[in-house]
């Protein structure tokens, strides 16, 4: 039985396993190694070259040499000492790995999005609810100090009633060395795999899921690039929430230099705020107002993982828990369905 399921001092070491040590997983690994009171005891990946690099990274720290596996089920079966499991694998594998890790009693940090289908999301929520451990999703922007302060300001009535939300993610294409990402059946397409971060901030702001969505998108520039690509390179979607509230979101992957950027804006009766910078402007007044936000020594990924360890120790419900992560993932799926089917799609259809 994982030690965290027994009475334990907050100073006791938390033993960590990381499943998936590719691009995102290796970054999570570097950050979890910096969290006090943590020991990485096991690593798992199908790619032995990546596994060797991750093993060398861990071995050079106070954690010492970790055990390595290419089969996550074998790892979970053999290593009864694992307290928490970090999952950073392709999205279509999240459900089976997370449920298995929860069932053996570990707490789970699963990278976003939760899954590629609404059915798998629901199964993960059910598993998290019945688990002895804690489930936290990798929606790490909830731990970014500026975004967190901005949303607290909105919730306190700082910008008045929320009237409109606007976001966009306009960037260059992702590296073409990750084949699964460009297969929409494996990644969920980029509205689910990437845009879910921003959609999560907006659902956190509103506190409700949208009633319906409609949109349009396709592949206009990166045609068959990389070969076999099925993920969109551009789309736009509008969500309608209760109380006549709308969210406008667009996502482009072929922006030239100077046009790229990411925005998360909330407009209210008293003014508007940019979540990422914690900067707002009062209506009918000139000049920006920056909210007082202390500088963070670490980025949001570290802060999210550090919070996860604290939550696992205390058996406390995370800020980015299974229910909130499910809503944000399914908001992305609602937009995806509306885009694919070129019609208005209601929440109840998911």
Model-identified regions with their sequence ranges:
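Short strand-turn motif at the edge of the Rossmann-like AdoMet-binding core
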Residues: 43, 112-114, 138-141, 169, ...
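N-terminal glycine-/serine-/threonine-rich beta1-alpha1-beta2 phosphate-ribose binding loop
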Residues: 1-110, 119-132
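Short beta-strand segments
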Residues: 86, 166-167, 214-215, 248-251
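Predominantly a Rossmann-like dinucleotide-binding segment in NAD(P)-dependent oxidoreductases
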Residues: 20, 24, 130-137, 141-229, ...
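Active-site rim elements
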Residues: 137-139, 185-192, 221-225, 251-254, ...
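Short glycine/proline- and charge-enriched loop/turn segments
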Residues: 105, 179-185, 287-290
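C-terminal helical cap and adjacent loop that interface with cofactors, partners, or active-site loops
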Residues: 27, 197-203, 210, 234, ...
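Non-transmembrane alpha-helical segments in soluble domains
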Residues: 29, 55, 73-76, 98-102, ...
């Amino acid at each position: 039985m994982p030690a965290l399921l027994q009475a334990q001092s907050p100073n006791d070491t938390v033993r960590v396993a990381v499943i998936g040590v590719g691009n995102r997983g290796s970054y999570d690994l570097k950050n979890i190694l910096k969290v006090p009171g943590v020991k990485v005891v096991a690593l798992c990946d199908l790619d032995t070259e990546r596994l060797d690099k991750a093993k060398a990274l861990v071995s050079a720290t106070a954690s010492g040499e970790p055990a390595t596996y290419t089969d996550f089920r074998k790892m979970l079966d053999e290593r009864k000492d694992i307290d928490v499991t970090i999952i950073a694998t392709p999205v279509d594998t999240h459900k089976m790995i997370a449920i298995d890790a929860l069932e053996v009693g570990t707490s789970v940090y699963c990278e976003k999005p939760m899954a590629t289908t609404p059915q798998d999301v629901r199964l993960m929520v059910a598993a998290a609810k019945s688990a002895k451990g804690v489930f936290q999703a990798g929606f790490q922007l909830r731990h970014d100090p500026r975004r967190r302060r901005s949303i607290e300001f909105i919730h306190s009535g700082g910008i008045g009633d929320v009237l409109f939300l606007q976001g966009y993610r306009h960037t260059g294409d992702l590296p073409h060395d990750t084949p699964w990402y460009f297969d929409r059946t494996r990644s969920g397409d980029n509205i689910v795999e990437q845009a879910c971060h921003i959609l999560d901030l907006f659902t956190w702001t509103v506190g409700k899921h949208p009633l319906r969505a409609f949109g349009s998108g396709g592949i206009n520039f990166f045609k068959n690039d990389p070969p076999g690509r099925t993920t969109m390179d551009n789309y736009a979607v509008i969500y309608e929430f209760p109380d006549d509230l709308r969210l406008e979101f667009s996502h482009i992957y072929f922006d030239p230099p100077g046009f790229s950027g990411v925005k998360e804006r909330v407009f209210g009766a008293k003014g508007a705020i940019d979540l990422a910078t914690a900067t707002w402007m009062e209506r009918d007044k000139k000049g920006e107002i920056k909210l007082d936000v202390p500088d963070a020594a670490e980025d949001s990924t570290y802060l999210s993982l550090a919070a996860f360890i604290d939550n696992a120790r205390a058996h406390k419900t995370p800020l980015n828990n299974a229910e909130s992560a499910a809503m944000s993932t399914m908001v992305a799926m609602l937009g995806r369905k509306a885009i694919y089917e070129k019609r208005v799609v209601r929440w109840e259809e998911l």
